[in-house]
Amino acid sequence: MDISTIIESDTHFEGDTSASITTQGGGAAANVATWLAHLGEDAYLVSRIGDDAHGDALQKEFNQYGVRHSGIKHPDEKTGIVVILVSPNGERTMFPDSGSNSKLSSNDLPPLDGFEAAYISGYPLINPRSRANVLAMIDQLKSAGITLIIDPGTVGALQKIPFQTIYEWLALFDVAILNESEALFISQRSELEAALTMLAAITPVVVVKRGSAGSASIREKNVITYMPADKVDALDTTGAGDAFTAGFISEWLRSKEIDSAMKVGGDNGRLCIQSIGARPPLGAIGKGK
């Protein structure tokens, strides 16, 4: 669950700052699942929620979006919450509490027959309480022949993890989707093309989200592609990267054309930043294509 605080003036620490506060569903994997549903895809969300008011609201929301899920609420566990501060220029700072998701395990996976791909947010890997169980889940997904896609997580979170460990995680995946600062940090390079080349030696397909500059990718034979972004005023950038990821996954699985996948990802991200929150508008579900 996301609690978004839209800051309307300069922040006065230890005092009052004018703001608009809203509550809405969030979480990287859940955001990607709802945007996939927006694009007409059959999405199943693997997560854990607590038996609380936030869990009730999220299950209702997933049902409205058409996102399949286990339907289980776990007693004596609290649903994860992220407090998001949104600056006057639309940029955000997040304070996450993963709650029940810290206990994710292979027992939370559905039967894997019929699934083509799995997107995994890096946050459960970064979280030491869920890491071992999530690595076991990845093992199970790989054994089932499912294409694996990762968004590794923010620089702030990844700074706690040794680089070699991050590289070992990335080597488990077929596609890595991350933003430019994350790509530069993980690769320990100062230039984007050098970062792409380094990361492509670990993960076969690497896609870098560049915000208003668009996106870039590298694939077999070190072919690098840039996709510009159409300009639009940003109301709230929360979830824009997740919306891009969903658009990319949807088109890439359909066509295996990275250029068109980057374009659909950018279109989806642009739609996201024109409203508050990380989810697509409910009235548009299944109408994104």
Feature annotation, model-predicted:
Residues 77-80:
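Short acidic/glycine-enriched loop/turn segments that link adjacent beta-strands
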Residues 36, 179, 241:
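Short, conserved phosphate/pyrophosphate- and ester-handling motifs at nucleotide-, phospho-/glycolipid
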Residues 26-31, 135, 255, 259, ...:
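Glycine-rich phosphate-binding loop at the start of an alpha helix
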Residues 17, 140-143, 188-289:
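Conserved phosphate-binding/catalytic region of the ribokinase-like
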Residues 60-74, 87-224:
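Ribokinase/PfkB-type carbohydrate-kinase core domain
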Residues 1, 5, 51, 154, ...:
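Short, glycine/acidic-enriched loop or turn micro-motifs at the edges of active sites
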Residues 1-46, 53-60, 64, 234-235:
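Glycine-rich phosphate/adenosyl-contacting loop at the front of the ribokinase-like
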